[in-house]
Amino acid sequence: MKRTSRMFSNAATLAFLAAGVFALSAPLATAAEQSADDPVPTEEITAALKGMGHAPFPIGKPNSGYAQYFTGNSYLQPLAGGSGINVANVTFAPGTINRWHKHSKSCQVLVGVSGVGWYQIWGEKPQKMEPGTTVTIPEGVKHWHGASGGAWFQHLSIMLDGAGTEWLEPVDPAEYAKLNEAAK
């Protein structure tokens, strides 16, 4: 019983912070804010995202530390951390998704920022994510998320400091392909 109430408390706290970060940070940051020596094709990615609506957060650097858990290119831009909550903008190239995984010591709040993506909780149907879609994945629940087959996608990831990730098997490529085909 305590675990459920704590999980709800964490989820409620993270959802509240997600809304605040999204509302307050969007006017302050632009996707063009990258260092001059950064090899990321920032202008190309930003143009693609703006063509789908907007790109309010910096794209970040290649997510090379976690590349083995993604099917293609992803970029990570930390936005806040060190105060009990970690907030990052994750940018997925078209067709890029992560493996099935689960988090410990925190739920995960995902907030769609730009483009079109998917998330799926184990045993449930995949759900579309678009700008403004907010999802709370409870602690310990197996899931995946990422871009649709034909669009760039950005989401905020919000978790408590000290959260862990257990990476599991890849998403079935045939199931992902069917999902994208059905969405056309």
Which residues does each predicted region cover?
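Bacterial N-terminal signal peptides that target proteins for export
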Residues: 2-15
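Bacterial N-terminal signal peptides
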Residues: 12-26
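A short, N-terminal "cap"/entry segment at the start of jelly-roll beta-barrel domains
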Residues: 31-86, 166-184
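Conserved short histidine dyad/triad with adjacent acidic residue
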Residues: 86-103
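A short beta-strand-loop-beta hairpin characteristic of the jelly-roll/cupin
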Residues: 97, 104-131, 141
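Ligand-binding loop in jelly-roll beta-barrel domains
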Residues: 118, 126, 139-165
